[in-house]
């Protein structure tokens, strides 16, 4: 490409942003515990086994615990280290609660339960070594996606039920099943975690009378203190199923007393658009009488699970945008990508075959939020800027850090050739896209063959480099040109990506719009994220309105993610504050220009 091309690249990110998890730790943002008297050591030593763990990056905090990535000094195996200061375990009931949590969790081993790998202590801390769940929890998924597609909900719920079946077989009642305690590994497998409220049933028919703490999805029999047992977990799964399909919890109000009143009265409604089979299962689980609810072992025999499609795997892209379920698995060309042609074993009502011509792309109409969350982002930025975060007597920016909000996708490289063709860019997963001057977009996935084409009206088509309509030949050639340029000039080419099962359902966010000013380039993705790359010092902001968070990459290429509401509370440095003020102006510009052409002319 000629000298007319302008290029940019993203700074060095952490080892793999967006791939961290905090099993067993409540959502960050719970009231922060008082700072421990002692510093957490850099190397944690288990005195019994002599194993040494090197403390890595911060993963999050909640309740009394802080969580870090830790790695075995010898094997290099990576875990999540839950670290609790003993200064916060002074009362007998606090120590007993921690002991009970460890005692129950260490007795469990199942594919859908967070792995427990040991615990030890020194004079100042208790250390718990847990399986690292790199894709966080269903809570972050819910914040980004709200209502899921029915096959996704089935996929997650099946695994939750399997994990809970195991707990109940082992006489354990979890008592706090909620989105934030359902963690996800790299393969998007569910892992049940946080056994802080769990209890063990000592004899058949035992009804537990007390419960320390407030579960999110609390069952009516717990509120009435009449005694409760395994049925409370089925109630919670009913609440989870409702939340996954509807996009909000069934009894949610702004006031806890009102919520509890609704639970006692069983006052909730299921929207009309929910599949009657799904609605029926929710109603069965959310019955006030615990004995009327299905048992955990009966759930998977329900029609919701037996008659609907359950994907074997889901792609990582599902964490931020819906998958391609408009291509029903059996409607694909049988010779095309085997995993999708195989429906669940024992499926009662397989979808009818709908053969298509080889070159006919699969089309999906996109239902996009009108302003793609820009109004929410503007409000969030207005709020944080109005608090004057850098004008504090004491700025505690590190307290606002929330790694759970790390973006799933961002632009890692870009190249401006809009005088002729458009803007080319690469996402952090090594996929490459072009927003052409005619307002169409084309994305090449990191497998080097799959393509996603988005027309001016937002209609999406899925095709491949090896099989596409002739009308797209020129655009595919240009896309390859952009890709080769970025590989050669901006960063060394990424390693070959091994396709994983589930990738055939992937849909990537695309570049919705962009513009340049004298100071920066502003990029707006279809998942709502806005990225601002500053030219002079190469600092960057990635704003996510759904997580209400900002990722700041400073001059040292340090990559940190903050919750905007916590920056209001704890303050931030002048450098970040000035960039947040600039971001507000740019988001305002995006909003006022959204009806204009995709290539906004900056003044």
From Swiss-Prot:
It is linked to Defects in PLK1 are associated with some cancers, such as gastric, thyroid or B-cell lymphomas. Expression is cancer increased in tumor tissues with a poor prognosis, suggesting a role in malignant transformations and carcinogenesis. Residues 351-364 have a biased composition (Basic and acidic residues). It is an enzyme of class 2 (transferase). Changing residue 12 to L: In a lung squamous cell carcinoma sample; somatic mutation. A motif (D-box that targets the protein for proteasomal degradation in anaphase) lies at residues 337-340. Residues 53-305 form the Protein kinase domain. It comes from Homo sapiens. The modification N-acetylserine is found at residue 2. Induction: By growth-stimulating agents. It is found in: Nucleus; Chromosome, Centromere, Kinetochore; Cytoplasm, Cytoskeleton, Microtubule organizing center, Centrosome; Cytoplasm, Cytoskeleton, Spindle. There is a cross-link at residues 19, 492 (Glycyl lysine isopeptide (Lys-Gly) (interchain with G-Cter in ubiquitin)). Changing residue 210 to V: Reduced catalytic activity, but no effect on affinity for ATP. The modification Phosphothreonine is found at residues 6, 210, 214, 498. Residues 1-35, 338-364 are annotated as: Disordered. Gene3D superfamilies: Phosphorylase Kinase, domain 1 (3.30.200.20), POLO box domain (3.30.1120.30), Transferase(Phosphotransferase) domain 1 (1.10.510.10). Residues 493-507 are annotated as: Linker. This is Serine/threonine-protein kinase PLK1. It catalyses: L-seryl-[protein] + ATP = O-phospho-L-seryl-[protein] + ADP + H(+); L-threonyl-[protein] + ATP = O-phospho-L-threonyl-[protein] + ADP + H(+). Belongs to the protein kinase superfamily. Ser/Thr protein kinase family. CDC5/Polo subfamily. Residues 13-35 have a biased composition (Low complexity). Changing residue 210 to A: Abolishes activity. Abolishes checkpoint recovery.
């Amino acid at each position: 490409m000629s000298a007319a091309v302008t290029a940019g690249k993203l700074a060095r990110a952490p080892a793999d942003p967006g791939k961290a998890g905090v099993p067993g730790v409540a959502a960050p943002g719970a009231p922060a515990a008082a700072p421990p008297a002692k510093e957490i050591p850099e190397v944690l030593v288990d005195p019994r086994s002599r194993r040494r763990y090197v403390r890595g990056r911060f993963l999050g905090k909640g309740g009394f615990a802080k969580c870090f990535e830790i790695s075995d000094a010898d094997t290099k195996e990576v875990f999540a280290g839950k670290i609790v200061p003993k200064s916060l375990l002074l009362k007998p009931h606090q120590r007993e609660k921690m002991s009970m949590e460890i005692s129950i969790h260490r007795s469990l081993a199942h594919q859908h339960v967070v792995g427990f790998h040991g615990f030890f202590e020194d004079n100042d801390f208790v250390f718990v070594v847990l399986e690292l769940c790199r894709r966080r929890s269903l809570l972050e998924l819910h914040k980004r996606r709200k209502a899921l597609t029915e096959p996704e909900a089935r996929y997650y719920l099946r695994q939750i039920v399997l994990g809970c079946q195991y707990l109940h077989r082992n006489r354990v009642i979890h008592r706090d099943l909620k989105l934030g305690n359902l963690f996800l590994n790299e393969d998007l497998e569910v892992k049940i975690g946080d056994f802080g409220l769990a209890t063990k049933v000592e004899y058949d028919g035992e009804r537990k009378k007390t419960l320390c703490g407030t579960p999110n999805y609390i069952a009516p029999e717990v509120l009435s203190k009449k005694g409760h047992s395994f049925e409370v977990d089925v109630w919670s799964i009913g609440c989870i199923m409702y939340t996954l399909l509807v996009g909000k919890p069934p009894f949610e109000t702004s006031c806890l007393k009102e919520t509890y009143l609704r639970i006692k009265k069983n006052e909730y409604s299921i929207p009309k658009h929910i599949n009657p089979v799904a609605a029926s299962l929710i109603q069965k689980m959310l019955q006030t009488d615990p004995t009327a609810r299905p048992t955990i072992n009966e759930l998977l025999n329900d029609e919701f699970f037996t008659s609907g499609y359950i994907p074997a795997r889901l792609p990582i892209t599902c964490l931020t945008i819906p998958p391609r379920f408009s291509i029903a698995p059996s409607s694909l060309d049988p010779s095309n990508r085997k995993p999708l042609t195989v429906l669940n074993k024992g499926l009662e009502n397989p979808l009818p075959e709908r053969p298509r011509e080889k070159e006919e792309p699969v089309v999906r109409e996109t239902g996009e939020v009108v302003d793609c969350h820009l109004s929410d982002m503007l409000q969030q930025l207005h709020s944080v800027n109005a608090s004057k975060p850098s004008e504090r007597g004491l700025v505690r920016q590190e307290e606002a850090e929330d790694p759970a909000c790390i973006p799933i996708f961002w632009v890692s490289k870009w190249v401006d050739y809009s005088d002729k063709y458009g803007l080319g860019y690469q996402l952090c997963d090594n996929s490459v896209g072009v927003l052409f001057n005619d307002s169409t977009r084309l994305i090449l996935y990191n497998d080097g063959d799959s393509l996603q084409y988005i027309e001016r009206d937002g209609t999406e088509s899925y095709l491949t480099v090896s099989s596409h309509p002739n009308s797209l030949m020129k655009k595919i050639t240009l896309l390859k040109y952009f890709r080769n340029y970025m590989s050669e000039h901006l960063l060394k080419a990424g390693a070959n990506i091994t396709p994983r099962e589930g990738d055939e359902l992937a849909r990537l966010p695309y570049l919705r719009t962009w513009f340049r000013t004298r100071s920066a380039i502003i990029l707006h993705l279809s998942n709502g994220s806005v990225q601002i790359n500053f030219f002079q010092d190469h600092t960057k902001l990635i704003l996510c309105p759904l997580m209400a968070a900002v990722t700041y990459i400073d001059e040292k290429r340090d990559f940190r993610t903050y919750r905007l509401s916590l920056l209001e509370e704890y303050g931030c440095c002048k450098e970040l504050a000035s960039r947040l003020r600039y971001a507000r102006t740019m988001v305002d510009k995006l909003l006022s220009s959204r009806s204009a052409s995709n290539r906004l002319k900056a003044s």
